[in-house]
């Protein structure tokens, strides 16, 4: 479990700026939040060490790279012991098509977001990998029509 970190107004400004532009220089960041560069860098490092900032990455356009299909899979397991849940969660890490995997409550045990080149490659994954996985009982899929919101930022 993640421990909540006490953040002051400057920390919040730093986080807002970094969410908007993760490639900003420390000097520019310090200027925008109203402090000098050395304490700004110390604050950023502290936020990284505390796990508030998990990393920095480029947001890629999947369609531009040939991945035209986004689908969700709702997966139910036959047995939900802690070991079985952990085993399936670990298995999801080995599937390149799975972009995100969530353990959920309700009718399914896991929700997977998948990105594939096309319907055929997604079907191959579902049939040859997902449903063939030990302890998988049910798989329901939903193909997306269009994305209407893509907010990767946390509201702060």
Curated annotation (Swiss-Prot):
Signal peptide: none annotated. GO terms for molecular function: sequence-specific DNA binding. This is Leucine-responsive regulatory protein. PROSITE patterns: HTH_ASNC_1, HTH_ASNC_2. It comes from Rhizobium meliloti (strain 1021). Mediates a global response to leucine. Exogenous leucine affects the expression of a number of different operons; lrp mediates this effect for at least some of these operons. Residues 26-45 bind DNA. GO terms for cellular component: cytosol. Keywords: Activator, DNA-binding, Transcription, Transcription regulation. GO terms for biological process: response to amino acid. Homodimer. InterPro entries: ArsR-like_HTH, AsnC-type_HTH_dom, Dimeric_a/b-barrel, Tscrpt_reg_AsnC-like, Tscrpt_reg_AsnC/Lrp_C, Tscrpt_reg_HTH_AsnC-type_CS, WH-like_DNA-bd_sf, WH_DNA-bd_sf. Gene3D superfamilies: 3.30.70.920, Winged helix-like DNA-binding domain superfamily/Winged helix DNA-binding domain. The lineage of its organism: Bacteria, Pseudomonadati, Pseudomonadota, Alphaproteobacteria, Hyphomicrobiales.
